[in-house]
Every structure is written in C-alpha cells, then in structure tokens.
C-alpha cells in the first residue's frame, strides 16, 4: 500500500495530538503529516513531519497558501479541523492538486450560519430551539422578551461562530459580583438584558441569534457522510466542560439521535466528516468537519474517512464497521506539553 501525505489544518487545536496519532498509527501504511496553523506556537509544529504558518482561514489568501503547500509537500489529502477554514477550502477545492475533505460551498454556508441552520431544522421538522435573528438594541430586546425574558433565561450568539465564541446567557437574575467571585476561569458570565443592549448600537451593529436556552445533557453525532447519506457514525456525550472544552465522552447507542442526524445530513447534502451537537433534545449546532473522536483500536474514524475519500474503501465496506462501535467506550481528554530548546 502506498504511503500517504496528509495535511491537517488548525494543527494547534485541542484534538490535534490524538488525531495525528490516529492517522500515523493506522496499522496499514506509513503516513507523513503536514501541519498548518495561523499561530507559530501550534503543537502541530512538534508532532508533524512538516509545519507551515498560514493566514487565518477567513483570509482571502488562505486557500492559495494551502494549495502552494500541497504542491511543495506532495500532499494527498487535506483534512480541515477548523470551522473558519471551511468556506475558503470549499470554494477552492477544485483547484487543489489533491483530495480536500470538505462539503460543498452551499452546505458549508448553511451549516456555519446558525440562522440558516435553525431555519433548516424548522423546515424539516428536526428538533431545535426557538429563535430569532435581530440587529440593534431594540430588536434584540424585543426578541429576548418574545422568548420569555425576564421570566425565562435566553441565549445570544453571533450568526457565525465556532465553539462557544460569543455565546452568552441572558438572565434577569445574573449577579456580576457573584460570578466574579465564583466562576471558574474560562466560564463566560451571564448578562442581564439591559447590560447587553447597552453594548449594542441603536440600529445596525452585529446581527445576533437570540434563542431559547436549551437544557439537558450535551450529546453529539459524529460520522462520515457521502452525498447526504451517513455511511458510518455514532452518538456520544460531551461532559466535564473546562475552558469551553468537553473533557470526557461516552459512546452511545441511540437510534433516535442517528435518525435526527440523517435527516440533517440529507438536507444539507453533507460529505466527509460531520458533527451535530444537541443540548437535551434540541439541535444547537451542525459542524461539517471532523470533531473530537472517541478512538478504538479497531475503529479509526479519521483514517477510514480518508480511505473512503481516496476511493480505497467502498461505502459498503465502511458501513460494515458499524458492528465494531462499542457503547462501552469512554474517552478522557487531558493536558499534555512538549519541550524544546531554541
């Protein structure tokens, strides 16, 4: 079997070390890893065979920078990790000299724009939070009150964001002093509505998504899709949050969650890796990219997804791996470090 060169973007992100290890220790072939990141201090510099600093994913020159690296490094596959990398890669994927594991421009846009995502959920009858999009202090205040504020807590976030960036809970009982004294580092404080609107212009400004606060256990469905069909995937929990990151995961067996995911994947016509996040029974986010993986010795999702994209594995052969998914599987994320001299 031929050696592979895989380029992994955002190689300073939290899941990078485990992902690179899974790609390298695949049991079949030698893999050469090329990491890219917008930051010099990315762990990919130390864990990959080659490393390049690139512009941010939102930069117009991002895709051209990656194309140049792919040509110089002889890359076979590009595996993006960051939401912000997807639009540029999707728009330019036909110009790459290799396979890029990204969905279509339309699928990426509809997934990344949370208002588009929630409109899609409403249209197909998938469970999602009640929501409004609003711009300016009066519109945001009216949207919050329509969702039950001050009697109910509501949430706000930008239309396009990644992870918990920009996410805030609006609570009439928010106590700034108590939060100052008791919140752990990295926990964003709740705001009163009047505190938020004081930050907003009367008209214009950023467009926000104002939503009901979903409550309950966090779960995701992670998998590999082709042409809007889930070929292989499974649900898992997201637990033990620290600085905005889940640190503990349990693989689940839940047909209802898989049905919800299939409806969304079909409507978006997703390809390659995807991650769909729920809080309680409400879908809150669709990520058309790889996310945290619960690895098994006999089930290497990242490597299998690459083999499917390269045509080395049929959909039927990939789907047969579903029998290996173990609901007993657990994963605990922890902090590690590397050292070097300059």
What are these regions (language model features)?
Residues 1-104:
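ATP-binding N-terminal substructure of ATP-dependent carboxylate-amine bond-forming enzymes
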Residues 110-208, 227:
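Active-site nucleotide/adenylate-binding loops and adjacent lid/helix of ATP-dependent enzymes
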